[in-house]
């Protein structure tokens, strides 16, 4: 005997359908499009780099503006007028046999010649600094290029500018690692991994030394005026040292443009309360509580010196930063705190003896 049919059961919620993954349509690039393809530039600037880093970039990187062109044009016109007037005075003095005026014209010509030579030298140094920015852009393009033939000549030019001899072990390892089948990206990458770290290590040592000197000088110095003068002098020397390591010679005008940033740095060294408050972001609360006011001020000034050196190093390098080879402020912070601890311990132990 058959069983009776069960009544229908109605559910309040509808049945859930299993989600099906939707695939995107395949995208293919032709050979012509692949040649013109360029990866999008990604801003790798850390979040902590703000107004201070922009000020360093503005101070170190040469600019071109309409105001500057107008001033240079006015100076050129004034110089041409002075030369023309000098020639006229010389001719009049020669015709009238006024030897005193003729001697004055000769002295003026020597002074003008020296001034023109200084201007030409300064322009050449600014042009060299501007060329370094172009070389860095060219290196960035080569690091994303698959062409062949430009990488080796470019790297050899960088080594020559930096004063690296052909017999240098790092350069010899680079020559041994490259071969004809490698493209420009691989050759420049090998140079960045084998040769460029030699100069970067020297620049790091200079930054560490100058930052430590700034820290210790402020800790032991009782006069704020001496602190400010010392910070200004050491910061300018640090910029010059880093530029020399990378084969760049800074001129008088470049130093004037850096002076604004140095003033910001020495003002920080002279404001102990501000340094102590900002220093909480760089070191822990317990360590800041154990350190004295002068020690906290010294660490703050040393960190600013290190930050200035890092930015100068970045703008003087012929190659962009690759992976994580950019020096970090935290590395110098740990070194400064360690050196300061040793100095304070030695100063405490010496009176006991």
UniProtKB/Swiss-Prot annotation:
It comes from the Bacteria. Signal peptide: none annotated. One of its GO terms (cellular component) is plasma membrane. The chain crosses the membrane at residues 70-90, 100-120, 213-233. Its main location: membrane. It is found in: Cell inner membrane. Keywords: Cell inner membrane, Cell membrane, Membrane, Transmembrane, Transmembrane helix. InterPro entries: DUF697, UPF0283. It is a multi-pass membrane protein. Residues 1-19 have a biased composition (Basic and acidic residues). Residues 1-35 are annotated as: Disordered. The keyword Protease does not apply. HAMAP family: UPF0283 (MF_01085). Belongs to the UPF0283 family. This is UPF0283 membrane protein YcjF. The lineage of its organism: Bacteria, Pseudomonadati, Pseudomonadota, Gammaproteobacteria, Enterobacterales. The gene is ycjF.
């Amino acid at each position: 005997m058959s069983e009776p049919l069960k009544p229908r059961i109605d559910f309040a919620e509808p049945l859930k359908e299993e989600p099906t993954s939707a695939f995107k349509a395949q995208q293919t690039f032709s050979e012509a499009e692949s040649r013109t393809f360029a990866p999008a530039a990604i801003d790798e600037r850390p979040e902590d780099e703000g107004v201070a880093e922009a000020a360093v970039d503005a101070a170190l990187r040469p600019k071109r503006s309409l105001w500057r062109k107008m001033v240079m044009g006015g100076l050129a016109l004034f110089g041409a007028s002075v030369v023309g007037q000098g020639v006229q005075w010389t001719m009049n003095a020669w015709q009238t046999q006024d030897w005193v005026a003729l001697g004055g014209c000769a002295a003026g010509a020597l002074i003008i010649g020296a001034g023109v030579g200084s201007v030409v030298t300064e322009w050449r140094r600014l042009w060299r600094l501007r060329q370094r920015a172009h070389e860095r852009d060219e290196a960035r393009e080569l690091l994303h290029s698959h062409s062949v033939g430009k990488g080796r000549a470019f790297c050899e030019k960088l080594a020559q500018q930096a004063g690296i001899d052909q017999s240098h072990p790092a350069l010899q390892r680079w020559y041994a690692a490259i071969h004809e089948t490698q493209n420009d990206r691989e050759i420049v990458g090998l140079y960045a991994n084998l040769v460029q770290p030699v100069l970067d290590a020297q620049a790091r040592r200079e930054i560490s030394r100058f930052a430590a000197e700034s820290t210790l000088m402020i800790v032991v110095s009782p006069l704020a005026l001496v602190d400010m003068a010392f910070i200004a002098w050491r910061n300018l020397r640090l910029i010059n040292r880093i530029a020399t390591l990378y084969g760049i010679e800074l001129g008088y005008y470049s130093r004037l443009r850096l002076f604004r940033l140095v003033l910001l740095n020495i003002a920080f060294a002279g404001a102990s309360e501000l340094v102590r408050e900002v220093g909480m972001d760089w070191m822990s609360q317990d360590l800041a509580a154990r350190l004295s006011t002068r020690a906290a001020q010294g660490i703050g000034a040393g960190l600013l010196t290190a930050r200035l050196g890092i930015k100068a190093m970045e703008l003087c390098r012929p190659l962009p930063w690759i992976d994580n080879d950019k020096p970090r402020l935290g590395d110098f912070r740990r070194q400064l705190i360690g050196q300061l601890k040793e100095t304070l311990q030695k100063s405490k132990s010496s009176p006991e003896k």
